[in-house]
UniProtKB/Swiss-Prot annotation:
The cytochrome bc1 complex contains 11 subunits: 3 respiratory subunits (MT-CYB, CYC1 and UQCRFS1), 2 core proteins (UQCRC1 and UQCRC2) and 6 low-molecular weight proteins (UQCRH/QCR6, UQCRB/QCR7, UQCRQ/QCR8, UQCR10/QCR9, UQCR11/QCR10 and a cleavage product of UQCRFS1). This cytochrome bc1 complex then forms a dimer. Heme b b562 binds at residues 83, 182. The keyword Membrane applies. It comes from Lepilemur sahamalazensis. This is Cytochrome b. The gene is MT-CYB. Its cofactor is heme b. One of its GO terms (cellular component) is mitochondrial inner membrane. InterPro entries: Cyt_b/b6_C, Cyt_b/b6_C_sf, Cyt_b/b6_N, Cytb/b6-like_sf, Cytochrome_b, Cytochrome_b_C_euk/bac, Cytochrome_b_N_euk/bac, Di-haem_cyt_TM. Signal peptide: none annotated. The keyword Manganese does not apply. Binds 2 heme b groups non-covalently. Heme b b566 binds at residues 97, 196. It is a multi-pass membrane protein. The lineage of its organism: Eukaryota, Metazoa, Chordata, Craniata, Vertebrata.
Length: 379
């Protein structure tokens, strides 16, 4: 009698990925965030699909169509707020997932790590374009400011910006193409997730100790399916609490004002999950320098495996690196706070110092500490 689960061409793939997958027995709850990100992506695609059924990507009616969804569509307000706060949950899980990768040295799995960074860029692009769609004041001016940064690229910058806008300013053409791209990108992200998992299952998961666990592995089901399900319940609880009780907590009040090209809001700022990068962008007085720092703030993760010559994979037994890691976390929280503040003293100076500390930690201080810890191992 053949086991269908193990022999059927399609079920075999699911079985080897989710049921009989050999998993280290000691991975902590921080390893839950991969599955939570999958859940977030699913929630976003489903809620987004229902929103797209009622949304119109036209400058004259976009704002009204969102109001119509909230007022006239059955449970439209729920779907809209689940989608908006689902993005915040998505990024919260993403940042913890990346942080866990840095702390426990998962960046040594190079292919998985690099596909993960591509995924991060993909999700950030999707979120940015989604923020433009309600066509409120912050949507319009956010789109204008961020796309205009590309004009800093020498020689082709201005042409590139006008090509993206589809005209000489952000308008109907921009909104239409942003909607099209916002719709297609999550499916591209889903394909990248498959590649991410494919590479991960080639090497197997890392674990908190950073030691090979080939001699002692357990099946993914029922142990980690149960554990992941608990994480999923907590995620849904948090998302529902946000969407039903505090739906506008993380939003901007300016986005409840229809887009007006003649009236600039006093403080243009993106959603909270982009504030750290926005603070880095603003901390450099030069436009091109700011754009380069903005891109490098994420792209530096690609260099991380080569900047960390550590002999112990995880930071679990490296107190100096642990200390610096938590300084990095505190620095990112500071940058997030600064990104939401107006451009005036003392925020300018704090932002510049925090940006300098961010790049110093990543490029110089953490690698040097790794080198010192390697030397200390020999004593």
């Amino acid at each position: 009698m053949t086991n269908t689960r193990k022999n059927h061409p399609l079920l075999k793939i699911i079985n080897n990925s989710l049921i009989d997958l050999p998993t280290p027995p000691n991975i902590s709850s921080l390893w839950n965030f991969g599955s939570l990100l999958g859940a977030c992506l699913t929630i976003q695609i489903i809620t987004g699909l229902f929103l797209a059924m009622h949304y119109t990507a036209d400058t004259m009616t976009a704002f009204s169509s969102v109001a119509h969804i909230c007022r006239d569509v059955n449970y439209g307000w729920t779907i809209r707020y689940l989608h908006a706060n689902g993005a915040s949950m998505f990024f919260l899980c993403l940042f913890i997932h990346v942080g866990r990768g840095l702390y426990y040295g998962s960046f040594t799995l190079l292919e998985t790590w690099n596909v993960g960074i591509t995924l991060l860029f993909s999700v950030m692009a999707t979120a940015f374009m989604g923020y433009v769609l309600p066509w409120g004041q912050m949507s319009f001016w956010g789109a204008t400011v961020i796309t205009n940064l590309l004009s800093a690229i020498p020689y082709v910058g201005t042409d590139l910006v006008e090509w993206i806008w589809g005209g000489f300013s952000v308008g109907k053409a921009t909104l239409t193409r942003f909607f099209a791209l916002h719709f297609i990108l999550p499916f591209i992200t889903s394909a990248l997730v498959m590649i991410h998992l494919l590479f991960l299952h080639e090497t197997g998961s890392n674990n908190p100790l950073g030691v090979p666990s080939n001699s002692d592995k357990i099946p993914f089901h029922p142990y980690y399916t149960t554990k992941d399900f608990l994480g999923l319940l907590l995620l849904i609880l948090l998302l529902m609490t946000m969407a039903l009780f505090y739906p506008d907590l993380l939003g901007d009040p300016d986005n409840y004002t229809p887009a007006n090209p003649l009236n600039t809001p006093p403080h243009i700022k993106p959603e909270w999950y982009f504030l750290f990068a926005y603070a880095i962008l603003r901390s450099i007085p030069n436009k091109l320098g700011g754009v380069m720092a903005l891109i490098l703030s994420i792209l530096i993760l690609v260099m991380f495996p080569f900047l960390q010559p550590n002999k112990q994979q995880t930071m679990m037994f490296r107190p100096l690196s642990q200390f610096l890691f938590w300084i990095l976390v505190a620095d990112l929280l500071t940058l997030t706070w600064i990104g939401g503040q107006p451009v005036e003293d003392p925020f300018i100076n704090i932002g510049q110092m925090a940006s300098m500390l961010y790049f110093s930690l990543m490029i110089f201080i953490m690698p040097t500490t790794c080198f010192i810890e390697n030397k200390m191992l020999k004593w």
